[in-house]
């Protein structure tokens, strides 16, 4: 038996399939047809030199205000840099070779 305190399903939950069908019937533009990953990648990547010279602590120095959490000791800097992963192998990061796939109705079925 159901509990009387259980929340009944919302209108959107009850009409999920109809909403999905309406979405695909509207034929939305979900992604550009041609994407050049090498061209887009440069706009948000940091050069290797900048990555090696700035520790995570240095990036945020001066933004912590007057509280004690705003001042890190050099010991925490050493610890943070020692756990930084500089390899892309097995980390799930993209090397630019992955193909973007547009969301289509056939992928959901």
From Swiss-Prot:
GO cellular component term, pick one: nucleus
Keywords assigned by UniProt, alphabetized: Biological rhythms, Cytoplasm, Nucleus, Phosphoprotein, Repeat
- Lineage, top-rank taxon, reads Eukaryota
Segments carrying the region annotation (Disordered) are 57-109
Biased composition annotated in UniProt, kind: Polar residues: 99-109
Q: What does this protein do?
A: Essential for biological clock functions. Determines the period length of circadian and ultradian rhythms; an increase in PER dosage leads to shortened circadian rhythms and a decrease leads to lengthened circadian rhythms. Essential for the circadian rhythmicity of locomotor activity, eclosion behavior, and for the rhythmic component of the male courtship song that originates in the thoracic nervous system. The biological cycle depends on the rhythmic formation and nuclear localization of the TIM-PER complex. Light induces the degradation of TIM, which promotes elimination of PER.
Under the subunit heading, UniProt states: Forms a heterodimer with timeless (TIM); the complex then translocates into the nucleus.
Supply the name of the protein.
Answer: Period circadian protein
Q: What is the protein's species of origin?
A: Rhagoletis completa
